[in-house]
């Protein structure tokens, strides 16, 4: 079971409280918790791919961290990016590999 998400409220609670509520309670509270349909690890892989393809690097870094918590290894993260580079763009891979190095370190 995923831990309770509070990032929306922590970062946007005063500025956009309804958005923060939807982020924490619906997206992470309801969708991400449906582990019978997809594991948190699989959801992390899908989310990493989606954020990579859109070039949303701040969110991508956050989800690389979350993916690591969900069991995605450094080698798997590298392979995800290598695969996606051919479909989404080589420069995106170059932008993402330093994030992987930062998140995973020398593992």
Predicted regions located by residue number:
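Short basic/hydrophobic patches in alpha-helices and adjacent helix-turn junctions
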Residues: 52, 66-70, 83-86
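Acidic, glycine/proline-rich low-complexity segments that act as flexible tails and inter-domain linkers
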Residues: 1-41, 65-69, 93-107
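Residues at the start of alpha-helices and the adjacent loop-to-helix junctions
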Residues: 41-42, 59
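Short acidic alpha-helix initiation/capping motifs at coil-to-helix transition points
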Residues: 21-25, 54-61
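Mid-chain, well-packed structural core segment of small domains
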Residues: 58-78
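Short alpha-helix boundary/capping elements
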Residues: 50-56, 88-89
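C-terminal structural segments of small proteins and small subunits
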Residues: 78-101
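Short, structured motif recognition centered on aromatic/hydrophobic residues
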Residues: 42-51, 80-81
């Amino acid at each position: 079971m995923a831990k309770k998400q509070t990032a929306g409220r922590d970062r946007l609670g005063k500025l956009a409280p309804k958005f923060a509520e939807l982020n924490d309670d619906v997206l992470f509270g309801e969708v991400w918790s449906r582990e019978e349909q997809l594991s948190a690890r699989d959801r992390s892989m899908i989310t990493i791919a989606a954020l990579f393809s859109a070039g949303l690097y701040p969110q991508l870094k956050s989800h690389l961290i979350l993916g690591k918590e969900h069991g995605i290894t450094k080698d798997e993260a590298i392979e995800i990016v290598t695969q996606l580079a051919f479909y989404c763009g080589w420069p995106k891979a170059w932008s993402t590999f330093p994030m992987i190095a930062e998140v995973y370190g020398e593992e």
